[in-house]
């Protein structure tokens, strides 16, 4: 998603998306550290609901990526611009972490691997901040690569094909998640 956002909107307009991912993950990781993972182990159907809600939202995002209009600077002269798409903003990206199954897996596995279950509030908070601090440069690389690809994808046809490809890959990424159901 960040690669596609970097291509379609550039690095600067993708920054709120990146910050939203890291902030949303910080809050979610903190909640996991405080015991939310225990809720999932006792009520596994909640994780299933989140998994399916996340999958539906990811399908919607794939549709948005596939149908996003190329930026005006890619359109041929004289062709009217389509209604411009907007990148996912801070709050949307932060909220998406709560239905993003991959983020849940990272938060739960991070805490279960690196943080003792009997840790106090300060250790849990410190671990959540550390996980989010590691997350930000990692997601930034995807957006930066997308911004660099933007120069290569100047032709409208290439950008449209790229967006379709990213949408298909996003849909394919759901297979490992949903094959258990």
What is each model feature region?
Residues 1-48, 106-132, 143-144:
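Juxtamembrane transmembrane-helix termini in multi-pass membrane transport proteins
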Residues 10, 100-101, 155-156:
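Short loop-to-helix capping motifs
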Residues 67-85:
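Flexible cytoplasmic inter-helical loops of multi-pass small-molecule transporters
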